[in-house]
């Protein structure tokens, strides 16, 4: 059954406000295309940050 029939909210009008959460310091690749080092530490730091919503 389609979402309209179940009265789901219209998700086309949802806009994300503010800056994106993705930060370069947590990215798996650098701007020049090389791979960042210490992936386990990056993933842990990204998961522990509190700058969301």
Curated annotation (Swiss-Prot):
Record-level GO cellular component terms: endospore-forming forespore
Region (Disordered): 1-53
Primary localization: other
Any one GO BP annotation for this protein: sporulation resulting in formation of a cellular spore
Domain of life: Bacteria
Induction: Expressed only in the forespore compartment of sporulating cells.
Biased composition annotated in UniProt, kind: Basic and acidic residues: 16-32, 39-53
Keywords: Sporulation
Keyword field contains Isomerase: no
Residues forming coiled coils: none
Location of this chain's protein in the cell: Spore core
Family in the record: Belongs to the SspK family.
HAMAP family (alphabetical): SspK (MF_01504)
This protein's name: Small, acid-soluble spore protein K
Natural source organism: Geobacillus kaustophilus (strain HTA426)
Lineage: Bacteria, Bacillati, Bacillota, Bacilli, Bacillales
Chain's gene name: sspK
